Structures are given as structure tokens and as C-alpha cells.
Amino acid sequence: MQSIHALLLTAAVCILFQGCGGSEPEHRLYAALFKNYNQFVRPVKNASDPVIIQFEVSMSQLVKVDEVNQIMETNLWLKHIWNDYKLRWNPVDYGGAEFIRVPSGQIWKPDIVLYNNAVGDFQVDDKTKALLKYTGDVTWIPPAIFKSSCKIDVTYFPFDYQNCTMKFGSWSYDKAKIDLVLIGSTMNLKDYWESGEWAIIKAPGYKHDIKYNCCEEIYTDITYSLYIRRLPLFYTINMIIPCLLISFLTVLVFYLPSDCGEKVTLCISVLLSLTVFLLVITETIPSTSLVIPLIGEYLLFTMIFVTLSIVITVFVLNVHYRTPKTHTMPVWVRTIFLNLLPRIMFMTRPTSDEENNQKPKPFYTSEFSNLNCFNSSEIKCCKDGFVCQDMACSCCQYQRMKFSDFSGNLTRSSSSESVDPLFSFSVLSPEMRDAIESVKYIAENMKMQNEAKEIQDDWKYVAMVIDRIFLWVFILVCILGTAGLFLQPLMTGDDM
């Protein structure tokens, strides 16, 4: 047992010394480089020479865009390359080692910060290591999560484009001490992780030399302009399409007949559904008072649309149920709504001639137009004084017999001249005259009822014409309003 322990201990010691022997050149190199190294002094031989910093930003992820607080959160990799003459060596003296990785906190680094940082540290963390090359070139690529200030314009939300800038530069050194050189002309997007809400259109970079009011020196900065476009699919499905459907239901209110009694009910139901929908999506819309978002304008447009439909529906129902006892139809209403507008909108109304042609001809002539079935128990068998086709109807048989006998009496008592109506009426019996007078009274009442019904039908037709007018008006307003609102961002996007 003791021999086994001795064997294991010997193997561990051998492995340890072997590892130390393999890293011994790197250990000597590290000790030689930082023996007299001062990390607070710029790595230049001449104090008047600037340190050339090659700088590039790589976008890893666009985390979030906060429209309310005007903040863009990004995950970036900042690439710094410069030359430090104090960190040079001959690879031959150190086992051929050409590269060495050292903690970035032990070497001099440029203090590159994000000028328009909104939250958190302005400078990146130095916990990552830097790569040193035997020629003195230092490559340092620290990752960082920045929350930069960005002026968000939500006018065309959810079809909006944003331009967010990120300004990097040295906070302490002017151009005479540190000169920045941009690597490439755009932000590096090779390792970019696609966002589910935003798409990056382009991200050009620019170098600026600016003289600030506080100082006489010129400071160099590198600014990236990030042009991003919101992906509107989520908002289209969950916000815009429901609003379009609600607007379509509002249009159908004017196609619903007034007699069904459900026009106002449908209007109120549509308004309630829109109100509930607005409460649900309130948190989705950017809550800002600077501008009204496009989707907010459309929701407001739909709300006014539905409210106006309720007002018009109440007016149409008021017109629909008017009677001669309560309202007199003006001449201009009859001219415009019964004659002019129906022809313009291709509305056809059955005329009185067509209705009369569909009725059967009466059995009585002009001289006996007031004859009718005067038996109250049998008057239910016939309609409007016309002979029915049922030969067993006693009422119609009686009318035929009376008409035949009366015609015979008139023929026998008449001469070659035409029959005098007064004589014709005088030969009737008193009972017959009373019956005829009663029938006259009934006929006059029926005529008055028919005239009143015609006026009521005219009011109903006026209400139908008004409904048809607003049906087309609301269809046009819905189409033009929707197209006008949502074509604006498309035309703006083409200019970018």
C-alpha cells in the first residue's frame, strides 16, 4: 500500500515539474517585460509623439430599445490595437514565443469611453486579457454592454426607422497624445445576433476632430450611426388587423336594415370591443407625450369613426320612424332624397304603376265603384274589394248577382241615351244606399291610411338613402384613412 502511494506521489511531482518546464520561457518573458514597466506612462519614446490607436466596434447583439427613456442597449466588442515599444522581445530568447496574453490591468491602455452613455460605467471593464506580439503590437478586445442615449422618434410606430449614434473617444488625452484610426468604414456585423424586433440597415463609422468650449486642444472621436428599422409583423397581427376588422364592422352598421332594431346595439358592441382592445394594448404602445405614434393616430381615428357611426345611426332611426302626424316632409327632402340621390347611387324603388299592375282588376265599373261586400261576416273572404277565385265564396257570388240584376234594371229603364247617374242611384233601395254610403266611408278611411302609409314609406326610403350614403362615405374614409396613415412610413423608408 505504501509503495502505491509513493508511486502516485512520484507521478504527480513529475507532471508538475514537466508543466513548469513547459511554461518556463513564458514565465521568464513575463518577468522580463514587466520588470521595470510603468502602466501609467504613455508608450512613446518621444513625449510629443501621439499613440496611434486603431479602433473598431463589433456588434454582438441589439438587446433593447427603450422608447420611453430614449435608451438603446447593445452588446459590443471594442477592438483596440496599438504599439507599445516597451513590450518587445526576441522570440529566439524565449523558446520561440511570439505571443503572450497578459492581464489588461497590468499594461497601459487608452481610456476610450462612450460619450453618450446613459446608464452604467462610461469605461469598459479591464478584467479581460490583452494579446501581446513580439513586435510590441497590443490587441485588446473587451466586451461591454452599453446603454446609450438615443433620440427615439415614434411618429411612424410600428413602421418607424431610428438613427442612434454611438460616440467613442479618449476622455483624458487630446489628439496630440492619442490619435484614433478607424478600422474599416462600418461597424463589424459578422458576429451579430439577429434581433426579433429590430433590423440593422447600416452602421457607418466616421472620425471627427472637435474643439470643445472647455479646452483649447482638439479631441478625436469615432462616431457610429446605427440605422435600425422596427419589424412590424407582431404589431400588424396584434394591433393593426384587429383595428381594421373593427372599422369594417362599423361600416356594416349602415348596411343593416333599420327595421331589425339592432343597429344601435351593433354600434355600442363595436365601441365596447374597441375600448377593451385599447385597454389591452396600452402597454404595447410607446408612452410618450412628444409625438402621437402612428398606431395611436389610427386607434383615435377608429374611435372617432365608431362614435360618429352611433350618432348617424340615431339620426337615421329618427328619420326612419317619422309619420305624417309628427313630421311634414319638405319639398327639398323629397326632391333630393327621393329623386336625385337614388339615381346617383343606382338605387331602384318600385313605382306605384308597377305596384298597380301587379294587383287584379276590380269587378266593378266606374258607375259602381263603391259597391262592395257589405256583409261584415263575409268581408274577411275578399281583399280590397276584388273578386276572389274561390267560387264558393258567398260574398263574391252575391256581388255578381247584384251587379247582374242592377245592370238589367238599368238596361230596361234606359233609352238610347246614356244612363243618368242620379237616376241610377235613385232606383236603389234605401238599404242599398246606406250600404253604399258605409262603403264610401270605409273607402275614404282606407284611402287616408294608404296615403299615410305612402308618406311613412317615403320617410323609410329617405332613411335608407341616408344609410346608403354613409355606407359609401365610411367605406371611402376607411380605405383612404388607412392607406393615408400607413403609406407615410413606407414613403419615408424609401428616402433612407
From Swiss-Prot:
Gene Ontology BP, a term: synaptic transmission involved in micturition
Subunit structure: Neuronal AChR is composed of two different types of subunits: alpha and beta. CHRNA3/Alpha-3 subunit can be combined to CHRNB2/beta-2 or CHRNB4/beta-4 to give rise to functional receptors.
Family stated for the protein in its record: Belongs to the ligand-gated ion channel (TC 1.A.9) family. Acetylcholine receptor (TC 1.A.9.1) subfamily. Alpha-3/CHRNA3 sub-subfamily.
Topological relation to the membrane, as annotated: Multi-pass membrane protein
Protein name, entry field: Neuronal acetylcholine receptor subunit alpha-3
Disulfide bonds: C150-C164, C214-C215
Keyword Transport attached: yes
Glycosylated residues (UniProt): N46, N163
Transmembrane portions of the chain: 242-257, 260-276, 299-317, 466-484
Keyword DNA repair: no
